[in-house]
Amino acid sequence: MGKKSKAQSDNVSQPGKTDVTLPFLGGKAAIDPTVASLFEKSAGPVKAPSVQPIITQRKENGPEDDVEKEEDDEEISELEEDLQSEDEDMQDVSEVAGDAERTLAVDTQAPSSKKRKRAPAEDLEETYMRRIAKEEQKEQEKRRAEKAKRQKVEEGGKDSDPVSDKSKDGRDESSEEEDEITVPRHETQSGDPESKELEKSNRTVFLGNVSSQAIKSKSAKKTLLKHLASFLSTLPESTGPHKVESIRFRSVAFASGGKVPKRAAFARREILDDTTPSTNAYVVYSTVQAARKAPAALNGTVVLDRHLRVDSVAHPSQIDHKRCVFVGNLDFVDNETDPEEDDKKKKKKKSGPADVEEGLWRTFNAHTKGSKERASTRGNVESVRVVRDRTTRVGKGFAYVQFYDQVCVEEALLLDGKKFPPMLPRKLRVTRAKKLPKKRDGPETGSHGKALGEGFSTLQGRAGKLFGRAGAAKMKAEGRKSISGNSVVFEGNRASEGSSRIKIKTKSRGSKGKPKNRSAKRAAAYQAAGGRKGKMAK
């Protein structure tokens, strides 16, 4: 084969010979010399086309670039080729950044490295937020240090000059202004005012039987606040800084009798102590954990010579009539005198004024034993509810006392017909509390006709207290929307006694009277005669 191919190449190279034959063909076929001449010379391997880069002229932005170009003409001429390749990659970046900074950066780079390796850029937003967080932390630490210094100065230097007092007052005002500065929040975190109030109710605690001295005296108020924060040290620090944010007094009887606005009467301290020396209050804690633990830690404790009633607003304690006692024949007003004294008209030594609420706390705690652990610490009384008028705070003459233990009810019934002066000068009427069913038109129903549960009713109660009647009615209307409106989702209720009974309507036999027509009489006579047997016997 090699020899034949050599001969073939020799025959093709000779231009004079026209009739060339190939041995591997079947016959003697002639080859066209014009076609054969095309394959005489080879062009060789194909070379890749060389693309020449387009030279782009840089725009002049300012006089500083002109000065640098005049000084560094030689260096820029050597690096023009490198800059052309880098301009294609960094064209977008060069439009944003200044040309002066780019030229200085190029001069420092080595001319051999055409493509530089870029380091991963840091996230500017993360670094900015980190810096802001550090600054806020430093500011908070400074404020805490300043507060601690101020407290030490106030405690140590009470007998100071008036000039120094003025300077301290100025510092206090400036520090209070700094404390009032709040960190801005996003609108998704701020929320609506209604949702804020509901969230605030989870951190709110109700106080009953609070001494009215806390309104009149600043020292008494400080004592009360210190007592309310006494258990916060036992809470874990990880849940947040626990403290008492605010306290507001409610159900206060004013001496003006409604002629003066309540705020003005409160500012003047015109409080009517003749009706009752106690009042109610609401305390707001900074965390939900503190508000949850406050009832268990503070209920039944003594502060300002009165037993404190503590209960949660969001999750109030259950009223159990089996552990309750009804107490009647109480004084309407606390300064009421003994009726037997007016009849006898005898001069006696003046005794202390009556105090219905505190007297019930002390009397039933002293005369009930219950469990030894409970009696040794705080007593067996869980709560005392004296029914009073809203505006005048005059009592209705009866109250309810609830115990922790059901055994204490039997011991409390033994106090019927007894009196305990001076706080309870009248004879008490003690009976068991009865559970009276509330008469309602019907249960609240949703859009699908299902009865709403206890959770919805408790929410309605809180809405009525926080937002008033109009706000509660608005929330009630929103709650009746369909589930697609993101209102209330019903997931079922727990089984209770008697709920498993299925009510089926059955036909009552004998409810309708028997017919008294002719056919009924004939049937009765037929049955009386013994039926078919009686007929055949005849």
UniProtKB/Swiss-Prot annotation:
Residues 127-144, 151-173, 182-202 have a biased composition (Basic and acidic residues). It is found in: Nucleus, Nucleolus. Residues 203-315, 323-435 form the RRM domain. One of its GO terms (biological process) is maturation of LSU-rRNA from tricistronic rRNA transcript (SSU-rRNA, 5.8S rRNA, LSU-rRNA). Signal peptide: none annotated. GO terms for molecular function: RNA binding. Residues 502-521 have a biased composition (Basic residues). InterPro entries: Nucleotide-bd_a/b_plait_sf, RBD_domain_sf, RRM_dom. GO terms for cellular component: nucleolus. Keywords: Coiled coil, Nucleus, Repeat, Ribosome biogenesis, RNA-binding, rRNA processing. PROSITE patterns: RRM. The keyword Plastid does not apply. The keyword Nucleus applies. Residues 1-25, 41-203, 336-378, 433-455, 476-538 are annotated as: Disordered. Residues 63-92 have a biased composition (Acidic residues). Belongs to the RRM RBM34 family. Involved in pre-25S rRNA processing. This is Nucleolar protein 12. It comes from Aspergillus fumigatus (strain ATCC MYA-4609 / CBS 101355 / FGSC A1100 / Af293). The lineage of its organism: Eukaryota, Fungi, Dikarya, Ascomycota, Pezizomycotina. The gene is nop12.
